[in-house]
Amino acid sequence: MAVPKRRTSRSNTRSRRAQWKAKAPALAKCSRGHTIRPHTMCPTCGRYNDRQVLDV
């Protein structure tokens, strides 16, 4: 099994870990103007793609 020849420095470790960040979710507007995730039904008005799919 491979063993590291040298210890990884703290700055190298932290620089590598700095890339592990969560992305903000993409947001869209429903036809009534509410902010939703794309390709999902609006939980406020129950519409998807300008159609009523759920009675809220």
From Swiss-Prot:
Region named Disordered: 1-26
Keywords: Ribonucleoprotein, Ribosomal protein
Residue ranges with Basic residues bias: 1-20
InterPro entries noted in UniProt: Ribosomal_bL32 (IPR002677), Ribosomal_bL32_bact (IPR044957), Ribosomal_zn-bd (IPR011332)
The keyword Lipid biosynthesis is annotated on this UniProt entry: no
Any GO molecular function: structural constituent of ribosome
Superkingdom of source: Bacteria
GO BP, one annotated term: translation
Entries under NCBIfam families matching the protein: rpmF_bact
Protein's recorded name: Large ribosomal subunit protein bL32
Species whose genome carries this gene: Parafrankia sp. (strain EAN1pec)
